[in-house]
């Protein structure tokens, strides 16, 4: 660990040497290679060895100390690391892998060396925490004579461009210039958020976190910042609506047309993604209007508990409740024909969390979200009795659905909190399906449904959002949801009941 100054006066000498894999190399001070010295450098074992500290080579530029603690033992066999090979004439010192550390106060690490090539030298972006300027110059980051290849100095981040120059004294200066996020990002889905971030550039945690090393990392970070990947909560709400339909349809009649069903946490049927579980109750009241017409009223409520998001960029349910309201009408005709109409309204009030995790960032943004779902379904069906107790019902029809997703304001994630506006989605789907019902005489029964159909029409509004660290400017959200696809549903259930016991298994 170097907390002061290391001066190298001999040829082919090095400031640091790593003998094993369990130690640390730390440079919080300066390293000076004396005039006339050749073949020397920072690390004896080569560039792949990590040096920590303010003037290390890992780009972190954070002061660290290990000497106050018990130093690790050197293992019996040393690690094999490829060493840098000196030039044939031994005339140049090796700086490849050296990172010029910069700090929020505008200072930069300095290296004194003569007869050296600056190929492989880079500059980190620690300075961005202290300034909102998009162009900053650091003087004399490398001092000495016969310094070559200053123009090859690079930035540790794709967001910044480093331009090295040699001044009149022979020392090397570096100017760091910010690139536009729109010029660096290659994913078209993040273009609008990149534009907003460019317009609102300043020095805060959000912008510092975007100083990543590769274009792929920037694309991923911008997607997480925009919230476009946070889709699980509302998708799970749709799944929950289907679960209520199944629970209500399977409800056994208690008396006078009243049916009741319940499922509780701990039951495999009461599980959603991200370890979310729920308690759900379903009530159904059936009324006979005429000899050929029936009416059913449905109500249900569910209480949810979950662990939130388990995927970077996505969201997940942490709690909340849902309510379900249904009205069904059936008209029977001769020869087993039926005309079925159904109206549903579901409302979901959910607590959620969104994960933002890239680089050194690990944030959780909490929110309260609301989704309302309205559906009208009309279909014609014909029932065929294959044998006693076994019926098959093919059906076809159309479904109109409208979803309204409320706006929300996130909290607890600082600069990464999103303010999202409301959005809507309207679609018309065709329906073609087949139902199978079996009722045995020994207490066993089974049912299965296979349904599918193409989307006929789809319209959705454009959702926009703003992120706290970039001010109030808004950008478009592209969640990848489009119409024109094929919708499908498959369910199956087996039930056994007797006076002493009951068993029910459902799959979907």
Per-region residue spans from a language model:
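Residues on the lipid-exposed face of transmembrane beta-strands in outer-membrane beta-barrel proteins
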Residues: 281-287, 325-331, 345, 376-382, ...
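Surface-exposed loop/turn motifs in large extracellular/passenger domains
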Residues: 1-13, 17-94, 107-119, 145-150, ...
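Outer membrane beta-barrel translocator domains of Type V secretion systems
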Residues: 207-388, 482, 504-508
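Outer-membrane translocation/initiation segment of Type V secreted surface proteins
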Residues: 62-80, 94-112, 124-291, 369
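Outer membrane beta-barrel transmembrane domains
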Residues: 323-327, 420-508
